[in-house]
Swiss-Prot record:
Cofactor names: Mn(2+); Mg(2+)
CDD domains in alphabetical order: RNase_HII_bacteria_HII_like (cd07182)
Domain of life: Bacteria
Enzyme class: hydrolase
Annotated organism of origin: Ralstonia pickettii (strain 12J)
Classification of source organism: Bacteria, Pseudomonadati, Pseudomonadota, Betaproteobacteria, Burkholderiales
Role played: Endonuclease that specifically degrades the RNA of RNA-DNA hybrids.
Protein known as: Ribonuclease HII
Amino acid sequence: MASRKPNPDQLGLLLSQEPAAKRARRILCGVDEAGRGPLAGPVTAAAVVLNPRKPIKGLADSKILTARKREALYDEIVEKALAWHVAEATVEEIDRINILHATMLAMQRAVQGVAALGTLPDLVQVDGNRCPQVAFAVEAIVKGDALVPAISAASILAKVTRDRQLAALHIEFPLYGFDVHAGYGTPQHLAAIDLHGVTPHHRRSFAPVRRALEGMSAISIETVAAGSAWDD
């Protein structure tokens, strides 16, 4: 069961009243996600507790880093962090409970994964304006991926992991360009859906995919009707 969480103003006051030495010893867990907007693939979340004795240079919002830089930082984060865990919510879960709740679920799983390793955060800091239900104090930080190093690290782990998943998906479905757009609704991706249809990895609750399915159903009905007329 999640503990009662103070509101952001209360939390900021509590933190400001703590002695500096105590704040320095706090175990802070950064959390971020990747893949809320795409039409295909899971939504991925990561939780990271950095080691203050092993600083990592160059941490930043994963979206402004090159793929090469993200990959290099991924390896360094995994090596130096006190604890980290990457989790996801599947396409089926996204379609069943919606993308917002699925994102919160993935974040919750990521934090639980860190705790399962024996690292219990004093504070979980989440990018954005919403917090998952976790058994620790938690705060949301808008643009946290650019402001809080642990959240930056989490954003990098989440994005690199998801990009690798979509690159692997491209091998299975090479006609869709998943290795290029990572499932986002680019013109190339939308054209591929129109031409080749929807895969099991597409989010049927998302409007462009839903419209494509409805169009395919209409074509099927017309084809059956035309066949019946021909038989008559």
